[in-house]
Amino acid sequence: MSSLREIILDTETTGLDPQQGHRIIEIGAIEMVNKVLTGKHFHCYINPERDMPFEAYKIHGISGEFLKDKPLFHTIANDFLKFIADSTLIIHNAPFDIKFLNHELSLLKRTEIKFLELTNTIDTLVMARSMFPGARYSLDALCKRFKVDNSGRQLHGALKDAALLAEVYVALTGGRQSTFKMIDKPNEINNLTVKCIEVQKIKRSIVVKPTKEELQKHKEFIDKILIQA
């Protein structure tokens, strides 16, 4: 049986509309295989080549000064596209992130690059609206509903929010499978941090209830991302 690779993804931006000159400033993406968080993730801050509006700064706390020495999007594009290749993207309010990512890709003016498609995404906002009509659907609201600890989320952050969304997505789809074993092997690639892990062999077709030890390892992994982001 083939593995199901999903990427939980989030971005932070300078504003709401790329057509008004707004750009992506942070990308966070976390790998999940057969509903198991593998520990592998992609994270990068990006120099937007423009100022940071105060309204955006109040949301994520990322300043223009902080981003001055960060890479431009074109320098990290290949690594990002390689990381998400052949995977379903899990995004909360997918049209927003896809719109911004495709705008950044269009600025590269590289004909060989294909734009991202909404048909290859799962929108957790749409899922939540379908499952809980009339409820609140923000990430914070869903964390509260599923008892996901978001106490450290004072400001938005792409990797932090992707980690929280991973927990929410697993809850929305009925629970996690098996476990993983962390192996710390950080590699710095164009200001990206990729951590490798060893996934234990599992029975792909069986959903199992996690043990206390597995839940603790899972919590430690999420906490590690929240601290590093």
From Swiss-Prot:
It catalyses: DNA(n) + a 2'-deoxyribonucleoside 5'-triphosphate = DNA(n+1) + diphosphate. One of its GO terms (cellular component) is cytosol. Binds 2 divalent metal cations. Magnesium or manganese. A divalent metal cation 2 binds at residue 10. The active site is at residue 156. Its EC number is 2.7.7.7. The keyword Signal does not apply. Its cofactor is Mg(2+); Mn(2+). InterPro entries: DnaQ, DnaQ_proteo, Exonuclease_RNaseT/DNA_pol3, RNaseH-like_sf, RNaseH_sf. A divalent metal cation 1 binds at residues 10, 12, 161. Substrate binds at residues 10, 12, 55, 60, 161. GO terms for molecular function: 3'-5' exonuclease activity; DNA binding; DNA-directed DNA polymerase activity; metal ion binding. It holds the Pfam family RNase_T. DNA polymerase III is a complex, multichain enzyme responsible for most of the replicative synthesis in bacteria. The epsilon subunit contain the editing function and is a proofreading 3'-5' exonuclease. DNA polymerase III contains a core (composed of alpha, epsilon and theta chains) that associates with a tau subunit. This core dimerizes to form the POLIII' complex. PolIII' associates with the gamma complex (composed of gamma, delta, delta', psi and chi chains) and with the beta chain to form the complete DNA polymerase III complex. This is DNA polymerase III subunit epsilon. The gene is dnaQ.
